[in-house]
Amino acid sequence: MSQPLKEKYKSEIVPNLIKTFGYKNIHQVPKITKIQINRGLGAAASNNSTLQQTIEEIRIITGQQPIVTMAKKSIAGFKLRENQPLGVTVTLRNTLMFSFLERLINLVLPRVRDFNGLNPNGFDQHGNYNFGLDNQLVFPEISYESVDQQRGFNITIVTTAKTQVEGFNLLQSYGFPFKKN
C-alpha cells in the first residue's frame, strides 16, 4: 500500500528541516511517532448503547479497535464509581497513522464548517500538537443516519520535536492548514 505522506517525509520534509534547523544527523530530524484519539463520554457514560456507538464510530474512523477507559476510583462529587466507563481512546502508529493523517489533512479538515485553519497555539513545550473536532460527521466514513448525537473528540499528534517551532514546521511541512497570526 502506497503511503504518500511517508514518502513525502523522506524525500521533501527531511531535507527541508535539515536545511532550516541545521541538523548534523538525519536522526535528529523530528518525526511523528503516534496519533492518539480520545473521546470522553461525560454524562452519557452510563448509557451502554452510547458507549457501543462511540466504540463503533472510533473504530470506523481509525480502522483500529479503541480501548474503553475506566474510572480508577470513586468520586462522589462527580457521581463517579470505580470501573465506570469514562471514554474511549485509540493510539495509531505506522501504517494506520499515515492513513489517518492523509484523510485528516485532505478530506476531514476541509469539510469542517467555518474552518479558518488550525490554531497554532495547540503545541505543548515538547512539540506535540493537540486539537479537537466538534463533530464526527466530517469523516466521510460516518453516515448521518447512524448518528444520534453529535460528539467531538480530541486528537493528539505526538512528535519527536524538541521545541514548539520544530513541531510547527514539521506539521506545516506535512500540509496542516494553520491559521495565519
Curated annotation (Swiss-Prot):
Subcellular localization, as worded in the UniProt entry: Plastid, Chloroplast
GO biological process: translation
Highest taxon above the source species: Eukaryota
InterPro entries linked to this entry: Ribosomal_uL5, Ribosomal_uL5_bac-type, Ribosomal_uL5_C, Ribosomal_uL5_CS, Ribosomal_uL5_dom_sf, Ribosomal_uL5_N
UniProt entry tagged with the keyword Manganese: no
Gene3D superfamilies: 3.30.1440.10
SUPFAM superfamilies xrefs: RL5-like
GO molecular function, one term: rRNA binding
Pfam family, one: Ribosomal_L5
GO annotations of cellular component type: chloroplast; ribonucleoprotein complex; ribosome
Keywords noted in UniProt: Chloroplast, Plastid, Ribonucleoprotein, Ribosomal protein, RNA-binding, rRNA-binding
Keyword Chloroplast: yes
HAMAP family attached to this UniProt entry: Ribosomal_uL5_B (MF_01333_B)
Functional description taken from the UniProt entry: Binds 5S rRNA, forms part of the central protuberance of the 50S subunit.
Subunit structure: Part of the 50S ribosomal subunit; contacts the 5S rRNA.
Family: Belongs to the universal ribosomal protein uL5 family.
PANTHER family: 60S RIBOSOMAL PROTEIN L11-RELATED
UniProt-recorded name of the protein: Large ribosomal subunit protein uL5c
Lineage: Eukaryota, Sar, Stramenopiles, Ochrophyta, Raphidophyceae
